[in-house]
Amino acid sequence: MTSNESEFQLAIHNALCSCLGLPPSSEQTLSLIRQAYTEPENSPQPARTADVIYWSLSPESAEDPASYNETVASAGTHKPAVHRYLAYQLLIVCYGPGCEAYAHRIRSFLYLDGAGLPRQILRKAGIYPVPDPPAPQLLYEPEGSLWRRRADLTIPLRVRDDLVYSVSRGAITSPPAVILHR
């Protein structure tokens, strides 16, 4: 990811909140939607009966022609720019009794477009969900002597990356000296 990583994270969080019809900064939202931990073995384990949604954004490992779709333009700055669309995957893991309903709701509502709706929230941050993601997978995960419900959802994304060509050339501060010979 580029320097806009926190902007991307905020946009994804807000889009997920919009899918579920929750205000982004409420206590209920903060306890329900969480970014995945980088070290899962050290992450806190919520109660088996609690609904929790973890998400993470990672680059796709396979070479996808869409990830190399580059267009050259100058965005009114008179500097050449390359606009690339990099392939990423949004992995959403839902736990708890309502995990399947949450996963289906996110999959269905992520593509709604309009003011304050998920697709527009993502588009403002340069994130474009690829239509028709696969259906969520319902799994059961062992937790002690009991089973915990889990639904996995993977959504392919394209993230816009703008590269502006800028070469610093030494500025001419005074005209060059001209020597005339007779």
PLM regions with names:
Residues 104-111, 170-171:
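Short amphipathic alpha-helices in soluble, non-transmembrane regions
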Residues 82-98, 106, 148-159:
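Oligomerization/assembly interface segments of phage tail-like spikes and tubes
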